[in-house]
């Protein structure tokens, strides 16, 4: 992945400020709306053994691990093949990929994923499911 220049990405900076300045411990899971078109999904789940890759066209994802650990598979969208076609309303498509890397994520880690970054989140680091609380911030492109 290429380095990002945050001073040229004001919406990403804004999303990071939201993450830094919000205590999510007392907020229930669900969708959170912000005035500038940024929104977030606060979720709690158990990791899984495998999943399809996904990609988005309208939003950048910032995936922030609030508690727990998981790994996220990441690869270039152009190397994937379509599995489930793009749903414009949900801004998601599901893909298959053969050449990818896993990034291990632990409490306090975040990962910025651009539309060119296909990803499969919520994967167990070892073979057993792990309890995770995660915030996925959606930043309009």
Task: Describe the role of every protein-language-model region.
Residues 110-112, 129-141:
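A short hydrophobic beta-strand segment most commonly corresponding to one strand
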Residues 29-66:
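A short glycine-rich, His/Asp/Glu-containing loop-to-beta-strand
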Residues 58, 95-100:
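Short alpha-helix capping/helix-loop boundary micro-motifs
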Residues 1-29, 33-37:
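Surface/interface-facing alpha-helical segments and adjacent flexible terminal/loop regions used
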Residues 60-64, 102-103, 110-111:
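His/acidic/aromatic-lined binding-pocket segments of jelly-roll/cupin-type domains
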Residues 32, 36-39, 69-85:
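Short beta-strand/loop turn elements enriched in aromatics
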Residues 58-60, 64-72, 79, 87-92:
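Glycine- and acidic-residue-biased ligand/ion/polar-headgroup-sensing regions
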Residues 104-124:
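Conserved metal-binding segment of the jelly-roll/cupin
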């Amino acid at each position: 992945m290429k380095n990002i220049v945050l001073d040229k990405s004001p919406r990403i900076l804004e999303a990071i400020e939201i993450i830094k300045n919000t205590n999510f411990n007392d907020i229930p899971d669900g969708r959170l709306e912000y005035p500038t078109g940024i929104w977030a999904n606060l979720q709690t789940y158990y990791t899984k053994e495998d999943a399809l890759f996904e990609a988005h066209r309208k939003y950048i994802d910032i995936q922030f691990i609030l508690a727990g650990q998981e790994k996220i598979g990441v690869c270039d969208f152009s190397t994937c093949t379509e599995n489930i076609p793009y749903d414009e309303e949900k801004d998601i498509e599901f893909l298959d990929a053969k050449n990818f890397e896993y990034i291990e994520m632990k409490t306090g880690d975040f990962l910025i994923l651009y539309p060119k970054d296909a990803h499969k989140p919520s994967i167990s680091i070892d073979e057993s499911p792990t309890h995770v609380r995660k915030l996925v911030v959606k930043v309009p492109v």
